Curated annotation (Swiss-Prot):
One Pfam match: PSI_8
Membrane topology of this protein: Single-pass membrane protein
Species of the source: Spinacia oleracea (Spinach)
Function: May help in the organization of the PsaL subunit.
UniProt KW keywords: Chloroplast, Membrane, Photosynthesis, Photosystem I, Plastid, Thylakoid, Transmembrane, Transmembrane helix
Family: Belongs to the PsaI family.
Protein name, per record: Photosystem I reaction center subunit VIII
GO biological process, one term: photosynthesis
């Protein structure tokens, strides 16, 4: 499967951003500071 060259950096930036956002919301919800 050949992905477009724009798709690779997009996933490389979006996936960590979603992971960090979900982790941040998880910490905020559980008040683990």
């Amino acid at each position: 499967m050949n992905f477009p060259s724009i798709f690779v950096p997009l996933v490389g930036l979006v996936f960590p951003a979603i992971a960090m956002a979900s982790l941040f919301l998880y910490v905020q919800k559980n008040k683990i500071v």
